[in-house]
Amino acid sequence: MARPLSPLDFLLAVLLVAAVVLLLARPHGHRAQAVLADPARTPGVLNPDVTQANIRSTICRHGWTATIRPPVSYTNDLKRRQMRLYGETGSLSDYQEDHLISLELGGNPTDPRNLWPEPYPRAAEMDRTENELNAQVCSGQLTLAQAQQREDTIKHTQG
């Protein structure tokens, strides 16, 4: 049978557990909750080259977004500026400069009104949502406008 803990051993165990809890609960450079896209700063802007009539040659064509994606030098500079505007103080690497209306759904690639700093891991979760909405548009389950509206609502209300 195990011997009972001495008062000192008990105190050390409690302190160790408290330290672990504090370390795990500590935010890592950004708020614990999602950064919502501010409708005033980031209302979302569409790419005029993408329409319902041409989705087969644009957003539904494999690899198309790579042809319009802005360079990292542009998005990192914008991310730095927008993080200050959004009051975010974490490391740049903790955020993705995300498109409110994604490239996969016909969002403008470079307009700052379509981009904002979204923290990880939420940014990665939203990438999956963007891909799912794109698949629904390309399969005819949703119109382009319906998918864009859903994405706008999600990012302005859920992060």
Region roles according to the model:
Residues S102:
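Short active-site segment of divalent metal-dependent hydrolases/proteases
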Residues M1-Y95, L105-G159:
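Nuclease and nuclease-like effector domains acting on nucleic acids or nucleotide cofactors
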